[in-house]
């Protein structure tokens, strides 16, 4: 006898006019998530979700497409102003912020929260091309 599958119940998130935008930009991908003022995620997108593969995921254009997809959903739900938190050393940080602003969501503040080691792990060796 087959087990019955139960669909996961969708969480109701209260959307305010003011929220947060988190942009995580690594060397391989970029992830954009828009949240309300409590930090509950309203919408998210990434370059991989938008159909970019391999090295094309870490381009400013891929970041622009991911931010546009994410911002459109959040704007339709009622998000109007965001405080942007940027993390990571990747390429598409500025283009993602510009795209969020261009989608009609006002950017009030930009904070860089990139983690910096106090001489922690050994970094990867330099590439020889």
From Swiss-Prot:
PROSITE patterns: RIBOSOMAL_S11. Keywords: Ribonucleoprotein, Ribosomal protein, RNA-binding, rRNA-binding. NCBIfam families: PRK05309.1, uS11_bact. The keyword RNA-binding applies. One of its GO terms (molecular function) is rRNA binding. InterPro entries: Ribosomal_uS11, Ribosomal_uS11_bac-type, Ribosomal_uS11_CS, Ribosomal_uS11_sf. Pfam families: Ribosomal_S11 (PF00411). Disulfide bonds: none annotated. Located on the platform of the 30S subunit, it bridges several disparate RNA helices of the 16S rRNA. Forms part of the Shine-Dalgarno cleft in the 70S ribosome. This is Small ribosomal subunit protein uS11. PANTHER family: 40S RIBOSOMAL PROTEIN S14/30S RIBOSOMAL PROTEIN S11. Belongs to the universal ribosomal protein uS11 family. The gene is rpsK. GO terms for cellular component: ribonucleoprotein complex; ribosome. It comes from Parabacteroides distasonis (strain ATCC 8503 / DSM 20701 / CIP 104284 / JCM 5825 / NCTC 11152). Part of the 30S ribosomal subunit. Interacts with proteins S7 and S18. Binds to IF-3. The keyword Ribonucleoprotein applies. One of its GO terms (biological process) is translation. It comes from the Bacteria.
